[in-house]
């Protein structure tokens, strides 16, 4: 027993040391908790400030991107059609040369080749196109004249209603000439940068209106010009 007592004493001292360590740790834990709370309280505003700075930087980056998107380079300069037409030559008028005119539409157009069209279109093609228009008028105008005479004779009895047939016939004649000119344009003249159309103009000798053939010069677009 004398031998075991020292060993038991050692065991007692070890257990006492363990109890003292546990007491020390328990006493240190409350003291450390305020420090941690204070550190968290101190670190909290710093983190908020950092978050605000990051948000401001993101907002600035978004604004910079929007400004870059808004500052798009201007589109390439394009020449407008009105600008090209302004510098085009004046159109050519082909007036009526017949001895009968019904509601401003003569029974014949002048077949003389205008000098302005020299180098633009062949005189033979010009005379052929005018000949087609004159042949259309030659067929339609005599019928219109007959209906006009009948309408004038019966005008008093019908209160002017007898003039409606000749008005409709004259409108149909104009439409047939317009279709003929469109066919001529698609066939030849658009390729030569010309455009034929039937339009109204004042007479040279009076203030009355008459139908003439207007030959316009189409603008040539600069297709080889860089953007």
From Swiss-Prot:
Biased composition (Acidic residues): 13-23, 45-72
Domain of life: Eukaryota
Keyword terms of this UniProt record: Cell membrane, Coiled coil, Cytoplasmic vesicle, Lipoprotein, Membrane, Palmitate
InterPro entries tied to this protein: CHIC1/2, Golgin_A_7/ERF4
Entry's Gene Ontology cellular component terms: cytoplasmic vesicle; plasma membrane
Coiled-coil stretches noted in the UniProt entry, renumbered to this chain: 46-73
Residue stretches of biased makeup (Low complexity): 24-44
Protein name: Cysteine-rich hydrophobic domain-containing protein 1
Organism: Mus musculus (Mouse)
Gene it is expressed from: Chic1
């Amino acid at each position: 027993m004398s031998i075991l007592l020292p060993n038991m004493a050692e065991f007692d001292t070890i257990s006492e040391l363990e109890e003292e360590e546990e007491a020390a740790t328990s006493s240190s834990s409350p003291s450390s908790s305020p420090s941690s709370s204070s550190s968290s309280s101190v670190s909290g505003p710093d983190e908020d400030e950092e978050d605000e700075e990051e948000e401001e930087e993101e907002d600035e980056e978004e604004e910079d991107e929007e400004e870059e998107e808004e500052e798009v380079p201007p589109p390439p300069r394009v020449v407008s059609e009105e600008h090209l037409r302004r510098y085009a030559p004046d159109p050519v008028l082909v007036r009526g040369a017949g001895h009968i005119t019904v509601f401003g539409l003569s029974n014949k157009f002048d077949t003389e080749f205008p000098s302005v069209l020299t180098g633009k279109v062949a005189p033979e093609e010009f005379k052929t196109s005018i000949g087609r228009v004159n042949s259309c008028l030659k067929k339609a105008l005599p019928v219109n004249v007959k209906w006009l005479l009948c309408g004038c004779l019966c005008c008093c009895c019908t209160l002017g209603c007898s003039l409606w047939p000749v008005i409709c016939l004259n409108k149909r004649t104009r439409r047939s000439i317009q279709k003929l000119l469109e066919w001529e344009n698609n066939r030849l003249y658009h390729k030569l940068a010309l455009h034929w159309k039937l339009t109204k103009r004042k007479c040279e000798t009076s203030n009355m209106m008459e139908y003439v053939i207007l030959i316009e010069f189409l603008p040539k677009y600069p297709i080889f010009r860089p953007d």
